[in-house]
């Protein structure tokens, strides 16, 4: 996979303010505010910044946390995991492997078959429904 390397100014020009704040500045959207939190359509969720396929809707589940949750990415190679010690916590941040967009965090409290919960900001995603 070819890395996408843009300046913050280039990202700011192509993203809306909320997308820029979360994807490029590692912000977080308010819980239960994202458009995909309750989404049930069948399809594939892509990175809003670079269009890399990230999650299949078949791996989406309702975790009750307020953000779209998935138990696995389409490919492990699509994600980079980074130790995050911000806000006095120890968590695992997940970023897009192609463009380094901040997506959210992964936690070890998800359902089978993986036991993982990828807690992802809606604003980082673009759902492409299956026909």
Curated annotation (Swiss-Prot):
Zinc among keywords: yes
Enzyme nomenclature, EC number: 1.8.4.12
Span of domain MsrB: 8-130
Keywords from the UniProt entry: Metal-binding, Oxidoreductase, Zinc
GO molecular function terms attached to this record: peptide-methionine (R)-S-oxide reductase activity; zinc ion binding
Catalytic center residues: 119 (nucleophile)
Residues the entry annotates as binding Zn(2+): 47, 50, 96, 99
Cofactor annotation: Zn(2+)
A GO CC term assigned to this protein in UniProt: cytoplasm
Cofactor, free-text remark: Binds 1 zinc ion per subunit. The zinc ion is important for the structural integrity of the protein.
Disulfide bond sites: none
Reactions this protein catalyses: L-methionyl-[protein] + [thioredoxin]-disulfide + H2O = L-methionyl-(R)-S-oxide-[protein] + [thioredoxin]-dithiol
Signal peptide limits: none
Entries under PROSITE patterns matching the protein: MSRB (PS51790)
Any one GO biological process: response to oxidative stress
Classification via Gene3D superfamilies: Peptide methionine sulfoxide reductase
Family: Belongs to the MsrB Met sulfoxide reductase family.
NCBIfam families found in the cross-reference section: peptide-methionine (R)-S-oxide reductase MsrB (TIGR00357)
PANTHER family named in the record: METHIONINE SULFOXIDE REDUCTASE, METHIONINE-R-SULFOXIDE REDUCTASE B1
This protein's name: Peptide methionine sulfoxide reductase MsrB
Biological source species: Pseudomonas entomophila (strain L48)
Lineage per the UniProt record: Bacteria, Pseudomonadati, Pseudomonadota, Gammaproteobacteria, Pseudomonadales
């Amino acid at each position: 996979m070819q890395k996408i390397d843009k300046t913050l100014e280039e990202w700011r020009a192509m993203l809306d303010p909320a997308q820029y704040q979360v994807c490029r500045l590692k912000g977080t959207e308010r819980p239960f505010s994202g458009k995909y939190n309750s989404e049930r359509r069948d399809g594939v969720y892509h990175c809003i910044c670079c269009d890399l396929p990230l999650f299949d809707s078949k791996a989406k589940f309702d975790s009750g946390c307020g953000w779209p949750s998935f138990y696995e990415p389409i490919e492990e190679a699509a994600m980079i995991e980074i130790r995050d010690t911000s806000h006095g916590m120890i968590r695992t941040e997940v970023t897009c492997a192609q463009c380094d967009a901040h997506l959210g965090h992964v936690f070890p409290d998800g359902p089978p078959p993986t036991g993982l919960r990828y807690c992802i900001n809606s604003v980082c995603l673009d759902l492409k429904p299956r026909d």
